[in-house]
Curated annotation (Swiss-Prot):
Species in which this protein is naturally found: Tropheryma whipplei (strain TW08/27) (Whipple's bacillus)
Keyword Ribonucleoprotein: yes
Function statement: Forms part of the ribosomal stalk which helps the ribosome interact with GTP-bound translation factors. Is thus essential for accurate translation.
Protein name: Large ribosomal subunit protein bL12
GO MF entries: mRNA binding; structural constituent of ribosome
Matching Pfam families: Ribosomal_L12, Ribosomal_L12_N
Similarity-based family: Belongs to the bacterial ribosomal protein bL12 family.
Signal sequence range: none
GO terms (BP aspect): translation
Alphabetized Gene3D superfamilies for the sequence: 3.30.1390.10, Single helix bin (1.20.5.710)
Subunit note: Homodimer. Part of the ribosomal stalk of the 50S ribosomal subunit. Forms a multimeric L10(L12)X complex, where L10 forms an elongated spine to which 2 to 4 L12 dimers bind in a sequential fashion. Binds GTP-bound translation factors.
GO cellular component, one term: cytosolic large ribosomal subunit
Keywords annotated in UniProt: Ribonucleoprotein, Ribosomal protein
Length: 126
């Protein structure tokens, strides 16, 4: 029997379909009594179990605290951010404090806060 080089083996694998490769792996595991699964590393025990870090917050609410002097500009920005109609956006601005965005990611919350503050509003992110 002729010895097959590694390169020849790789070329053979390139010509196989995923199903054929899967069958090959199963047969290889069976013949050589090995497993192709990656070993799972055991997690190291924490040094101080009481010193667990609080999970990082992933969702944020943007809260309009006050509209400021440029109320019309703030209403326009609220409409842009939320997609609300004019009446709904005005009601949201008039009813401060009110949530402009709920459950937004950090980037979206920061961007909305910057837009509203540029329009003259007082905004908080919680």
């Amino acid at each position: 029997m002729a010895k097959i080089t590694t390169d020849e083996l790789i070329e053979s694998f390139k010509e196989m379909t995923l199903i054929e490769l899967s069958e090959f792996v199963s047969k290889f595991e069976e013949v050589f009594k090995v497993t192709a699964a990656a070993p799972v590393a055991a997690a190291a025990a924490p040094i101080e179990p009481a010193a667990e870090a609080a999970p990082e917050k992933t969702t944020f609410d943007v809260i309009l605290e006050a509209a400021g002097d440029k109320k019309i500009q703030v209403i326009k920005e609220v409409r842009t951010i939320t997609g609300l109609g004019l009446g709904e956006a005005k009601a949201l601005v008039d009813g401060v404090p009110s949530k402009v965005l709920e459950g937004a990611n950090k980037d979206a919350a920061d961007a909305a806060k910057a837009q509203l503050e540029a329009a003259g509003a007082q905004v908080s992110v919680k």
